[in-house]
């Protein structure tokens, strides 16, 4: 009984993970050049470059660059967060998962949402009241600035680097798939555009790129879902009946549990994605773009609504693809497989319901999706270097101008590194990188953010030991696990049997923080505990926070 409950829980928690990561790592067959898609995409690029130009005229200070001056509303920020979080892997990956496995796809898509109530109830308000530009501002509020900011920046940069590699390789593969462009050209194109957005437009341009992309993605997905439902007379019963009639698995597509093999791995990945969401630097950074805690709370509310709606749409799109794409020989190759692989299910459905023009629109939106995500990641990485490391550790008292200069140099370096890594990892299995990024965010960033805000006995010693332990455990266990040790390094048997380390590394991080804080009797530790009350009052009331300035 317990095993069944565990498996069910794991199935609910285990979102996209390796399966949907296939959307960005699966077999790719280059498609013929799609001119409609290229024209639509060029229109999107022209619009976003104009926004970057407009934003660059308004970026006058450090606050403008990192947080858009704190002038973004809760609704706008909610849309931007949704735009930052709904990746191409979730659009193409989940619909492909539903196309192949049916009901299981819904379980996976809902898993992505599980982390958001944690952010809403535990983190959003206090984070906004205590921080200015990065989550390290919050973690180091009453702890020692140097060591804590160094740890937070390292955690952020590792997460950003891993996530960025996955997105860049995904971008290259996807563009090769959708547009028929060369992989290297695609990676360079994404890298250059990402640098332009962030270098000149800062957070303001990044926010609007994410908002536009979210609106386009939601509109495109809504139209596809509407056309699918129209085809079946707006009856879910007809949708499922027709899908079961044409799917090779028949009625089995309506039963759950086919994708979860090992409850521990599933639970571990589920926890990693759930708590990792609350430790992703580019997501946490978005809470400083609003004026106060109330707007921060609204942001999460709207973001969760948009994402929940989007994942329901992907479910309808997946079943629509079974019915309209799976049963249509025009979308199959000579071997009876879907042209371009299963990850093209949603793209073929766009062709089936809206013709070539709509196919071009959806292809362009899929590319825009990646651009929005990498822009947010780059800005988070740059702020970790310039604000946390340069201005608060290496060169205390640096002027705003010097800090911004370092930030912009970092953006350029990150752009070059992202392009090189994207080309280097072209043929590698990058599915594990998203899982590892979330595991590190959950094992290093999340425990420190949570306990610094809620646990009065936390000290610098505990945070440092626990944070580094969590980060190193996540990386070491991932290397010793089946993905890297067996598949990439070629050993016969993995030293660590589970694919994802989060269950173990999160536990080690929390235990490490608790043990080393509880046993810290130094005068410094005592002083840090005494300062909790002042921090608590500020986190509840927001007295003294920087509010948005009118431009």
UniProtKB/Swiss-Prot annotation:
The chain crosses the membrane at residues 8-28, 35-55, 78-98, 105-125, 151-171, 185-205, 208-228, 264-284, 305-325, 357-377, 406-426, 430-450, 465-485, 496-516. GO terms for molecular function: acetate transmembrane transporter activity; glycolate transmembrane transporter activity; symporter activity. It is a multi-pass membrane protein. The keyword Ribosomal protein does not apply. Its main location: membrane. GO terms for biological process: plasma membrane acetate transport; sodium ion transport. Coiled coil: none annotated. One of its GO terms (cellular component) is plasma membrane. It holds the Pfam family SSF. Keywords: Cell inner membrane, Cell membrane, Ion transport, Membrane, Sodium, Sodium transport, Symport, Transmembrane, Transmembrane helix, Transport. It is found in: Cell inner membrane. Transports acetate. Belongs to the sodium:solute symporter (SSF) (TC 2.A.21) family. This is Cation/acetate symporter ActP. It comes from Klebsiella pneumoniae subsp. pneumoniae (strain ATCC 700721 / MGH 78578). The lineage of its organism: Bacteria, Pseudomonadati, Pseudomonadota, Gammaproteobacteria, Enterobacterales. The gene is actP.
């Amino acid at each position: 009984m317990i095993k069944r409950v565990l498996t069910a829980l794991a199935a609910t928690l285990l979102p996209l993970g390796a399966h949907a990561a296939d959307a960005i790592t699966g077999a790719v067959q280059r498609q013929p050049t799609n001119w409609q898609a290229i024209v639509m995409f060029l229109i999107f690029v022209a619009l976003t470059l104009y926004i970057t130009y407009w934003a660059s005229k308004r970026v006058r200070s450090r606050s403008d660059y990192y947080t858009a001056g704190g002038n973004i509303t809760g609704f706008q920020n909610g849309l931007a967060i949704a735009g930052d979080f709904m990746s191409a892997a979730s659009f193409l990956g989940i619909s492909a998962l539903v196309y192949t496995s049916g009901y299981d796809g819904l379980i996976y898509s809902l898993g992505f949402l599980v982390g958001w109530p944690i952010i809403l109830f535990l983190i959003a308000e206090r984070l906004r009241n205590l921080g200015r530009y990065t989550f390290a501002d919050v973690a180091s509020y009453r702890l020692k600035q140097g060591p804590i900011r160094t740890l937070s920046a390292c955690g952020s940069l590792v997460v950003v680097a891993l996530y960025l590699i996955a997105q860049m390789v995904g971008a290259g593969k996807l563009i090769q798939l959708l547009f028929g462009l060369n992989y290297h050209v695609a990676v360079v194109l994404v890298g250059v555009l990402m640098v332009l957005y962030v270098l000149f437009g800062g957070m303001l341009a990044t926010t609007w790129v994410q908002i536009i992309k979210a609106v386009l993605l939601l509109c495109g997905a809504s139209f596809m879902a509407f056309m699918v439902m129209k085809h079946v007379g707006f009856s879910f019963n007809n949708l499922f009946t027709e899908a079961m009639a044409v799917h090779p698995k028949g009625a089995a597509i309506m039963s759950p549990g086919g994708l979860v093999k090992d409850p521990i791995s599933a639970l571990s990945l589920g926890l990693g994605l759930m708590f990792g969401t609350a430790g992703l630097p580019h997501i946490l950074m978005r809470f400083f773009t609003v004026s106060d805690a109330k707007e921060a709370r609204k942001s999460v509310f709207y973001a969760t609504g948009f994402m929940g709606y989007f994942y329901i749409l992907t479910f309808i799109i997946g079943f629509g693809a079974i019915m309209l794409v799976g049963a249509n020989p025009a979308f199959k190759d000579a071997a009876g497989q879907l042209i371009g692989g299963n990850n093209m299910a949603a793209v073929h459905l766009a062709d089936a319901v809206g013709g070539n023009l709509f196919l071009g629109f959806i292809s362009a939106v899929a590319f825009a999706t990646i651009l929005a995500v990498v822009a947010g990641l780059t800005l988070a990485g740059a702020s970790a270097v310039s604000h946390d490391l340069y201005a608060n550790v290496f060169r205390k008292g640096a002027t705003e101008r010097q800090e911004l200069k370092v930030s912009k140099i970092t953006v350029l370096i990150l752009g070059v590194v992202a392009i090189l890594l994207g080309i280097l990892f072209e043929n590698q299995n990058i599915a594990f990188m998203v899982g590892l990024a979330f595991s590190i965010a959950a094992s290093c960033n999340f425990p420190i953010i949570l306990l610094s805000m809620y646990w009065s006995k936390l000290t610098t010693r505990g945070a440092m030991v626990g944070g580094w332990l969590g980060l190193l455990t996540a990386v070491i266990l991932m290397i010793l696990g089946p993905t890297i040790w067996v598949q990439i390094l070629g050993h016969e048997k993995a030293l660590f049997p589970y694919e994802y380390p989060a269950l173990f590394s999160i536990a080690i991080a929390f235990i490490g923080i608790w043990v080393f804080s509880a046993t810290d009797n130094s005068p410094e530790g005592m002083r840090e505990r005494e300062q909790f009350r002042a921090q608590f009052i500020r986190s509840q009331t927001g007295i003294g926070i920087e509010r948005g300035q009118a431009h």
